[in-house]
Amino acid sequence: DVSFSYPGTNIPVLEHVTLSFAVGEKTALVGRNGAGKTTLIKLLCRLYEPTSGYITLNGIDIRKYSYKEYTQAFSVVFQDFHLFSLPLDENIAAGTEIDEAALQSSLAKVGLTGRVQQLPQGVRTRLYNNNGSGVDLSGGEAQRTAIARALYKDAPFVILDEPTAALDPIAEAEIYEQFSQMTAGKTAVYISHRMSSCKFCDRIIVLDHGRIAEDGTHDTLLANHGIYANLYETQAQYYT
């Protein structure tokens, strides 16, 4: 029963949210802008603490875990991810020792293997044009790199917040088709404004004004003719 308001305000962003994530389940969080999706994710990641209520992992209040121990269980790609002026492999390894096999596997899963082979120094190519010594990635390539970094970490819980926002429709479809493979054996939470992505998930949770409004599968929610069905059908008009 979690509620949250930002400091200095009495306006709840989330109100009386109760839900659980099953191991290995792929869940989509959807809703209109301002529904509370990203805030919920930040609570899960302990970037914020609930105003009331609590969150548990394996039945234990997450505040009882050390912050470092807890965050090792999560691989997260936020909307406002950052890449650094470092070689590509170091961006993906994110401060850990580079495992070449894991690196290549992560690149392959996000469809970057061919692009990396074209880089002047392969995975050792520095990102961003530092006096001509590096390369600038496109928005879509940067987003794929951020997803590769999350997969490289190999944490049991994967969270992707708008992971395909900078991709064109064809590239987006490729990522969706690989979604189950990319998160095989992991618990995954996926946020997207594009309802077409939700078909790839086991479960869809619809947030509306900070509360859970609907919870079910893609087909079930379409049949209910509620918020999800309205969002899905509204977007579908632009693709027909």
What are these language model-derived features?
Residues 2, 11-22, 27, 53, ...:
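Conserved beta-strand
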Residues 44-45:
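Helix-to-loop junction immediately C-terminal to a conserved catalytic motif
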Residues 54-56, 71, 89-132, 176-177, ...:
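ABC ATPase nucleotide-binding domain helical subdomain, centered on the C-loop/LSGGQ "ABC signature"
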Residues 122, 177, 194, 199-240:
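C-terminal portion of ABC ATPase nucleotide-binding domains
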